């Protein structure tokens, strides 16, 4: 049994090693055509590389602050995929023909939302208030303690008793005493 387990483990290890060494025929003889790297003392850097199978990339910037660059490769379908990007304090902004664009109906709805602000009726005053589309929407519900506005109507806060099963028994004797003792 021990020999069988060792054999299965060895076979699994060989299978993993054989699977990880596979290189497509188109990439077996790939050579690096260009490989440049420049790093300066102030943190600025620039690198670029290109391979014989059509993969290329370049990037430059100031480490941890802002970078810009791009890369390209040929897809299995033969289409050249190219991405250019900028990454800075405003985020990562990729540009490429293969990246989906925001549909027109979404852009139109965002414009409509921007030009037609949301209005909320104040619970206490009944006044309609325009709300900006950010955290200010929650400020409508916060009230100043020094504001002595009296609510016009208030819902009843009187507690009601609700029995989930049966109402309590009216007898004051414990359950043991209420049971009749068995007679023999």
From Swiss-Prot:
Keywords: Cuticle, Signal
GO cellular component terms attached to this protein's record: chitin-based extracellular matrix
InterPro entries in alphabetical order: CHIT_BIND_RR_consensus, Cuticle_Struct_Prot, Insect_cuticle
GO biological process, one term: chitin-based cuticle development
Bias (Basic residues): 175-184
Any GO molecular function: structural constituent of pupal chitin-based cuticle
Polar residues biased stretches: 147-160
Residue span of region Disordered: 147-184
Keyword Signal on entry: yes
Stretch forming the signal peptide: 1-15
Domain Chitin-binding type R&R: 42-103
Domain of life (superkingdom): Eukaryota
PANTHER family assigned: CUTICLE PROTEIN, CUTICULAR PROTEIN 65AU, ISOFORM A-RELATED
Protein function: Component of the cuticle of the pupa of fruit fly.
Protein name: Pupal cuticle protein
Organism: Drosophila melanogaster (Fruit fly)
Biological classification of the source: Eukaryota, Metazoa, Ecdysozoa, Arthropoda, Hexapoda
